[in-house]
């Protein structure tokens, strides 16, 4: 059924590649059109990101996350050895993502997409160019995963406008790879040593200050005013040109319709301080294929459920990460500059009506490859609801526990586990989860 439906994914980063693989697993005819990254960049990934890549089929890319770098935090006058992160060259990482796409026999086209997406007989039409020659492609659905610089034009909501200024450096040999983050008067600084005498320094600041910077010398003058010693600027040589890119939080108002959707940074992008964009991208790409499957194969009512489900998930993830960023900015109280004032007051706190948890509700869930409404148990840690613990359906269990005493619930729990042949180890994990989420208690 799905093999006759053509889906075009624009972009082959984490969001685009993992969405394409998910769609291929559902049997769709998938084509990925991408452009190479225009500049060299390094990025830090967590162990959780590595596990996410593996679960979504990006196994070759995950294998680049091998050597971890110690991450030091010098934030708000407090110094910590926070944790470790995998620092990878994004150009090499992107090539591995392409290899993952090839493993699934997904068609890949390196080309520049021209103009906006047109509609022909109610089907999206993409025009792209290779060596000055134009081609067009008709699709049943389009996924825009071209990152925060997507040409997709639409209104978006954004936070204070920050820009990150990135410079590659040649450094003396350092014993082990490392990264650090420092809060300073006019922003914050990320430094990285990635081995083979290669290092990076990145300064994130307000738009007004960033507009005064055209080269590394301009940035260096500002860094000298920050009253901080920077280890990456001891015996260094500048490599290449300074890269300037926006790094503020923004979310498109129109994320999805019945012909196309935005995934990853195309849909919403966050301040690097708020969290890892890769994890945010995978939160979207893990559900996007099932949303598309529903849109292309189900009734209008079911399509609307899927569209609303995706939109609300993206908005929830965005709100969650922006709050995390604000909490970090509020920790710094030494500076009263424009940079810190703006970010310590955004986003404004929402007066949300608190509902009782845990509770049973009917909500959209992914089940059997589609999005449909089903009963779920809403808990403090599962605002969208849960209907499974692993592969165990838990709604009947949750209903009984919420309607009966603790003693009766414990007896029913044992009967439930016995009837479903649940092992003792899994039963204990399920019981601990039910207690933690206040379903049992």
Indicate where each model-derived feature is located.
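Short beta-strand to alpha-helix junction loop
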Residues: 80-100, 210-214
């Amino acid at each position: 059924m799905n093999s006759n439906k053509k889906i075009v994914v624009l972009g082959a980063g984490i969001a685009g590649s993992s969405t394409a693989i998910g769609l291929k697993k559902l049997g769709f005819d998938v084509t990925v059109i991408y452009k190479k990254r225009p500049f060299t960049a390094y990025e830090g990934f967590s162990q959780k990101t590595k596990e996410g890549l593996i679960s979504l089929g990006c196994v070759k890319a995950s294998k680049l996350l091998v050597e971890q770098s110690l991450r030091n935090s010098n934030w708000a006058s407090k110094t910590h050895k926070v944790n470790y992160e995998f620092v990878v060259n994004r150009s090499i990482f992107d090539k591995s993502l392409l290899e993952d796409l090839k493993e699934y026999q997904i068609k890949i086209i390196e080309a520049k997409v021209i103009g906006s997406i047109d509609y022909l007989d109610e089907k999206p039409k993409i025009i792209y160019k290779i060596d000055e020659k134009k081609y067009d492609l008709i699709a049943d659905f389009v996924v825009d995963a071209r990152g925060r610089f997507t040409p997709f034009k639409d209104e978006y909501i954004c936070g204070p406008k920050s820009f990150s200024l990135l410079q590659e450096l040649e450094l003396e040999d350092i014993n082990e790879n490392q990264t650090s983050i420092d809060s300073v008067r006019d922003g914050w600084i990320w430094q990285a040593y990635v081995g083979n005498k290669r290092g990076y320094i990145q300064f994130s600041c307000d738009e007004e200050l960033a507009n005064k910077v055209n080269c590394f010398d301009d940035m260096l003058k500002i860094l000298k005013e920050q009253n901080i010693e920077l280890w990456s600027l001891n015996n260094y040589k500048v490599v290449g040109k300074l890269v300037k890119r926006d790094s503020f939080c923004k979310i498109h108002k129109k994320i999805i319709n019945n012909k196309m959707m935005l995934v990853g940074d195309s849909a919403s992008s966050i301040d690097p301080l708020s969290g890892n964009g890769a994890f945010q991208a995978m939160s979207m790409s893990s559900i996007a294929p099932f949303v598309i499957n529903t849109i292309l194969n189900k009734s209008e009512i079911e399509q609307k459920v899927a569209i609303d489900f995706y939109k609300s998930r993206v908005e929830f993830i965005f709100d969650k990460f922006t709050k995390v960023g604000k909490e970090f900015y509020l920790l710094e109280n030494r500076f009263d500059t424009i940079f810190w004032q703006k970010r310590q007051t955004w986003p404004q706190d929402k007066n949300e009506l608190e509902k009782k948890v845990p509770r049973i509700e009917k909500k959209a869930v992914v089940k059997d490859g589609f999005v449909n409404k089903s009963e779920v148990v809403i808990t403090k840690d599962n605002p969208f609801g849960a209907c499974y613990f692993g592969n165990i359906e838990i709604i009947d269990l949750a209903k009984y526990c919420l309607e009966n005493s603790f003693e009766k619930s414990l007896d029913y729990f044992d009967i439930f586990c016995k009837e479903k042949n649940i092992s003792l180890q899994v039963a204990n994990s399920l019981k601990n989860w039910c207690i933690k989420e206040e379903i049992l208690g």
